[in-house]
Amino acid sequence: MKIEYLSLQRITQQHADELHKAVQRVIDSGWYLQGKATNDFETAYAQYIGTQHCISCGNGLDALTLIFRAYKQLGKLHEGDEVIVPANTYIASILALTENRLKPVLVEPDMLLQLDVTRIEAAITPKTRAILLVHLYGTCAMHTIISAICKRHNLLLVEDNAQGHGLKWHEKHTGSIGDAAAHSFYPGKNLGAMGDAGAVTTDNNQLATIVRSLANYGSNRKYVFPYQGLNSRMDELQAAILMTKLTYLDHDNQRRRYIAKRYEEAIRHEAVTLIKPRNSVFHIYPILCKRRDELQQYLASKGIETLIHYPIPPHKQACYAAWNSLQLPITERIAATELSLPCNQAMTDDEVEYVIHSINTWEKTI
């Protein structure tokens, strides 16, 4: 049996007729940017997330960058201000901060691979102005302790919801629990476009107005530019595709949860550690294994594709050479042992059981 980590073709085929019709409507309209499809998606996604505003943009990194840039325009952030961020995050979270001349303060994760709330206050200094909460792997990173810390220290709470589409915390969707949130619709996400796309959600009217301007060259009306902005817009085709797929997001996430539950119930191997998050939409299903590379090669020999999220943490990347000497042992251990198993709505039950059987019989079949 051959199992891809993620087959975008199979996922697309599940709703191919509807997607073809949605794309055809855009083609026939003759309007390909900033039109009805984009407006409709922004309205629907804001309603789904539970915020007053959704501002579409070009990708998830731009969404994060625009949020911090807008807060600088509002005077809430200034160059050199510190932002607490999980050390094991994807590098986009860090890039959005350094692009805005803000200082990332890397905090180690907990046993669920999320920002460790018990380490946050020790990382706060007089220059700390915000927490960037990343719902890594599709697992909710929010905690009542984080709310209390933000109130106590007057900190902004910004969510990186790139991996958390459809996730909830206390009956509220992630993307609505902080001051603002960034969303990525990269094709491989739980809610994925057929190209790059992103969005910002917020209840802050001022922030929303500035983000929308910044995403459109800094313009608030044609040929008038109060800000130095970006060219970061979602096109009509991506909006129409996302509008179609949004209808199925909760159903797709239920399938992911079922697969994760089967893994948790049935994978039994002394060399494999299961994370077992309590609240997740399983954008990624991570396991930990000290012999990760051996296991990955073995699964490949069985036709099972796996990935690593992420093999080199941000503080060890060449682009952040000044941090290379930092000692973050938990983050580094995750980078050395994490392996992501296939877990998506297009998988069949037989494929899921084959992954389980292959792991459980690792070494017994050699």
Indicate where each model-derived feature is located.
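N-terminal "arm"/small-domain region of PLP-dependent enzymes with the aminotransferase-like
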Residues: 1-31, 302, 342
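Short beta-strand->loop structural element characteristic of the AMP-binding/adenylate-forming
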Residues: 103-112, 307
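Active-site phosphate-binding strand-loop segment of PLP-dependent enzymes
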Residues: 111-193, 199-201
